[in-house]
Amino acid sequence: MSKVTERVEAICQPVVESLGFELVDVEYVKEGPDYYLRIAIDKPGGIDISDCALASEKISEVMDKEDPITEAYFLDVSSPGAERPLKKEKDYENAIGKHVYVKLYEPVEGDKEWIGELKEVSKDTITLSAKIKTRTKVIEIDRKRIAKIRLAVIL
C-alpha cells in the first residue's frame, strides 16, 4: 500500500464507519492523464447507490479539508462487488468455504494463478482445494507469494 492510500484510508475509515459502513479497499491510480481515487465500501446486506452517494459526499468533504492528494483526481465510491478483494484478515476468515482467485508473484506447483475453494487460513499460508480437470488438489500457498486474492464467482 502506498503512502497516499495509507493516508487516505486513515482519513476515510472513521467517516465510513460513522455511516455504518465498512471500508473495504482504497486505490489511487493514474489512468491516462487522469488520477482516480477509488474507495470500496460495504455493509451487511450490501451497498446501494444512495449509500455510495452519501459516503461520497462525506468522504469528499473530509478529503477537501485534509487535502492529502496534491493532484486533481476523480473520486469513485462503490460496492466492492461480487469479486471483492481480500485485504484484511477478517476478509480471509469470511472467505473460508468460498471460491477465490489467487494471482501469485511466482509459481506454486507450476502455476501463477489458481481458482479454488479457500479451506484454511493461517498467519503465513492459505490452503485451497482446486479442481484440475477431473481431480481435486489441495494446495498450500505462502501468503508472501500472493500478489492478489479476491472472491471468485463460479458459474
Swiss-Prot record:
The keyword Repeat does not apply. InterPro entries: Ribosome_maturation_RimP, RimP_C, RimP_C_sf, RimP_N, RimP_N_sf. Its main location: cytoplasm. GO terms for biological process: ribosomal small subunit assembly; translation. It comes from the Bacteria. It is found in: Cytoplasm. GO terms for cellular component: cytosol. Keywords: Cytoplasm, Ribosome biogenesis. Required for maturation of 30S ribosomal subunits. Belongs to the RimP family. This is Ribosome maturation factor RimP. It comes from Macrococcus caseolyticus (strain JCSC5402). The gene is rimP.
